[in-house]
Swiss-Prot record:
GO molecular function: unfolded protein binding
GO biological process terms on file: defense response to Gram-negative bacterium; endoplasmic reticulum unfolded protein response; IRE1-mediated unfolded protein response; protein refolding; response to heat
Protein name stated in the entry: Heat shock protein Hsp-16.41
Keywords: Stress response
Record-level GO cellular component terms: cytoplasm; nucleus
Organism: Caenorhabditis elegans
Cysteines engaged in disulfide bonds, as pairs: none
InterPro entries: A-crystallin/Hsp20_dom, Alpha-crystallin/sHSP_animal, HSP20-like_chaperone
Pfam family, one: HSP20
Length: 143
């Protein structure tokens, strides 16, 4: 039985080997990194949605408080951050935008926010109080 080999098979294997070998030298270490880890603002921490309140915590430690904006349009809560840094070595711009839909029973005029020294932004919306209540029946005796 006559077996023919492709004249290119050894060449392809060698090319593949050399590509893998030189690829790690030619490109920076971060090329194959998980680029999601470079997204500093994608860290939504604790979310609480119970009978009394809805609250969310975000890590915004890479942003100055003056570079953050919180807007409420109906039940849509939008959180944005933009930071720009210029130096003699270059330009760095970080930004993020989050949209969170608040629950229907959130008391929208009472939404408040606070930021800690560690850069944790806490946004809290208390829930509306239940407007239904029990009405006692009083007995009135006739004279």
């Amino acid at each position: 039985m006559l077996m023919l080999r492709s004249p290119y098979s050894d060449s392809n294997a060698l090319d593949h080997f050399l590509d893998e070998l030189t690829g790690s030298v030619q490109f920076p270490y971060w090329r194959n990194a998980d680029h999601n880890s470079f997204n500093f603002s994608d860290n939504i921490g604790e979310i609480v949605n119970d009978e009394s309140k809805f609250s969310v915590q975000l890590d915004v430690s890479h942003f100055k408080p003056e570079n953050l904006k919180i807007k409420l349009d109906g039940r849509e809560l939008k959180i944005e951050g933009i930071q720009e840094t210029k130096s003699e070595h270059g330009y760095l711009k970080r930004s993020f935008s989050k949209m969170i839909l608040l629950p229907e029973d959130a008391d929208l005029p009472s939404v408040k926010s606070a930021i800690s020294n560690e850069g944790k932004l806490q946004i809290e919306a208390p829930k509306k109080t239940n407007s239904s209540r029990s009405i006692p029946i009083n007995f009135v005796a006739k004279h």
